[in-house]
Design a protein with these regions (language model features):
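Short S/T/G/P-rich N-terminal loop/turn motif that feeds into the first structured element of a domain
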Residues: 1-63, 74, 80-86
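Short, exposed beta-strand-loop hairpins at the edges of beta-sheets
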Residues: 69-71
Length: 86
């Protein structure tokens, strides 16, 4: 069964620079077969979320995602939530 990752975090500095680094991260992951979305809260422009649906192998995804975040200096604390279909 596949799962969807919802990863949310706060952005407290240059939104444009962080958005560019996140776009590069998501392009790399999409090329590896894990397309994602970048969202932000409607009522808080500093709270953002990455969403990656249909992850078949969570450990393989995390083994690619976490180092890719570090390479792009996306080291802010994040909250990972994994959901699957009922």
């Amino acid at each position: 069964m596949t799962a969807t990752l919802y990863c949310y975090f706060k952005i407290e500095s240059d939104h444009d620079a962080v958005r560019g680094r996140l776009a590069a991260l998501q392009a790399e992951l999409a090329a590896a077969g894990w397309p994602g979305q970048l969202l932000r809260r409607c009522d808080d422009a500093d709270t953002w979320m990455e969403v990656y649906p249909d992850i078949a192998d969570r450990e393989a995804f995390r083994a690619a995602w976490l180092p890719a975040r570090r390479r792009r200096d996306l080291t802010m604390p994040v909250h990972e939530e994994w959901f699957q279909q009922i």
